[in-house]
Every structure is written in C-alpha cells, then in structure tokens.
Amino acid sequence: KNNLTPGGDSPRAMELSATLNIPVQLIYDKPFLNALAEALDEQQEATKNSDLDVNSIIKETAHCREKANDFKAVLLTGATGFLGVHILKELTEKNVDIYCLVRNEERFNNQLKYYFNKIDLSRVKTVIGDIEKENLGLSESRYKDLAERIDTVLHVAANVHHAGDYADLERTNVFGTKNVIAFCKDADAVLQHTSTVSVHGAATVKQRYGKNILDESILDIGQRYEDNVYIRSKYCAEQEVLAARLDGLKTNIYRIGNLTWRTGDGRFQKNSVDNGYLHRVHAILKLGMVNENMDKYPTDLTAVNECAKAFVNLAFTGDTNEIYHLYNPNFLKTEDMFKRLDVPYRIVSTQETIETVFANADDRDIHVYMFYMIISGRSRNIEMKNEYTVAKLRETGFKWSEPTREY
C-alpha cells in the first residue's frame, strides 16, 4: 500500500525524485516508503563512515613519481569494449607482446571484425579469464606464468550502466579492480586504470560542500557519489587504486570523458542504443527544446580513436602515480552545437519541459532525457580541468582535434 511506483512507473519515479530531491535510482531500488526511509538513513551513515583521505593520498604519492622500466608485455582487460578494442589497435603498433583477458574469444573476434578491416594480431594472445573471479579466473599455474611475463596492466574493463543494481556494478568495477590490483602486486606490474570524469558527479549528484573544480590533483570535491550506482562504483574503484598506490604499487588513473564516434569514418559503439548522450541529442531534436538546467553543462566530444591513442601515449611514457583527464577540452554547449548544425530549438523552463516530456513519455529518447534533466537540476556545475594532461600529451606529440560540423 506504500508502493511509490506501482507497476514500475518510471515517469512517476522521476517526478518523485524531483519533488523529494532524492536519487531516482533509490526510488527504483526502494519503492516502498519504509524501505526508502531506511535506505536514506543508511546512505547518510555511509557518508559519515568514509574515512579514506583520497586527496591526501594523491598529494602524498605525487612526490613518489618515478619512471617504470620499458614495457615488453602488457595485459589488457576490456578488449571487447568500445575503448578497449581501440586501445588494442594502438598497442599493436608498439613493440610489445599483448595479452587480452577476455571471457569469450568468439565475441573478441567479432568485435575486431566490426571495428577494423585490418589489424595486426601477430603479437596478440587471448587469455580466457574473468576479472570478477579470484586469480582472474585462471588456474594457479596459468596465473603464475602470466604474472611472470607482464610488465603493465591496462585495466579498461568496466560495467558502464548508470542505473541498476549496485551489486552488479560493484562486482565488476570495484571487486574486479581489486582482483586486478592483486595481480599487479604479484606481477610487480604497473597498473594503468581507467576511470571516468563522471566521478565529479556534475549533473548527477549533489555536493556536500562547495569545491567546484575537478582537476588531476583531486578526487573528493564533496560529491555525494553514493547517490548514483555507476559513479559510486567508479569512485570506490579509484579509492582502491589510491590505497594500493599508498601501499607501494605503481599506478596511473585515466578519467575518460564522453566517448564518441571515430574521426574519419564515424564508426560508433556497437551498442549505441544504450548510449545516454545520443538519447539526449535525439530527444532534443524531437522536442525542439532544451531544458534550462541542461543547457549550462557543456559537453566534450572525445573521439574514441583519439582517446585510445592518448591513453597509450601516456602509458608508455613510463611515468607513474599520475592522474590524467582524457577528454577533448574543446567543449561544446548544446546551444553552440545546434547552431553549428542549423537546428532550431528553444531553451525552456523545467516545468514546461516536464509537461512536454510526460506527454511523450513512451518515447525512449525522451524518457532518458527526462532522467538526465531531473538529476541535472539537483547538482551544481563542476568545472573540469585537464591542462596538466594536455601538456603531458603535447610532450608525446599528441593534440586533440577541434570538433567540426562534419564530425
């Protein structure tokens, strides 16, 4: 009788989220009033109990930076993903042996065929395993043999769903990262860990206090990362990496931006139907309007092939204990993007947007747009900085391209 979203009513959940000023995911997870109240209490308690001073760790270990030895063999996780498969392509141009940890070799081969007409696999070996399992799902002898070979691990595997059961994301993004860390310690290998710029929480979660800038020297800016399952899992994964760094493991963290299609041929991710950014763009085109909250958040268009090249360039400098922000710094506001495309649209109030969206709630693009619109209204804009990363990339001969009208 206290069910807040009878029949799994998503628009109702979104409306409650905006009215009660609480995460929409929490309403999905705890649709009954008593359970919702208990969950809110637990979140507050979890916030109090977070005692790892991540910012101090970043500052302290930054003074311990040192060059790693030349890499001869690398282990790549997530090679079947959109970014991972492009990182693999970049690795094939390096003088290294490449071991790809995959759960399914057939899917791995299918991904290669989908993204590339030609790729040199002469130094690529597949290892059937699973980061979610102890010893990466390998036999003791296989694990030991691999640990003796590997110099660095490029950990790209992740669950990137922004809503769902936290246990699923935690299993991959947190526990999986812990298993990769354990392997790196056993192998005395450098960990190259992919994270996300979304750890800042802008347009997604509230802030506890008012730090409005996220650069490469900080993680905790007061964001209530617990309010979103994806951000929470990636924030906690960074905590694990930083704790390992404090314990002596050489690590780098790469916070990835809004990955978009390749330059040149426009090839995009295979599962583009799940891409939230495309849903938002499609919704704006259908509605002919942009909510006033969302228009203030500029977007980066980070071409996946450029991101992969930047990642590998930085990994192979040998620098360790770094944090990098891998996104194209040539930001676009929604207004600027649609002006370039000569697409007419209006900036409207939240109330007008809600009324229009509810009238079209059966449309998936508009449904997703509503989700992002509501959560963006609860968060302040966070200024992202990556000047340090851009300078380091410049040293490797890399420069981000300007998004053109054609792109």
Predicted features and spans:
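NAD(P)H-binding glycine-rich loop region in Rossmannoid oxidoreductase-like domains
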Residues: 120, 124-175, 185
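N-terminal Rossmann NAD(P)H-binding glycine-rich loop of SDR-like oxidoreductase domains
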Residues: 67-94
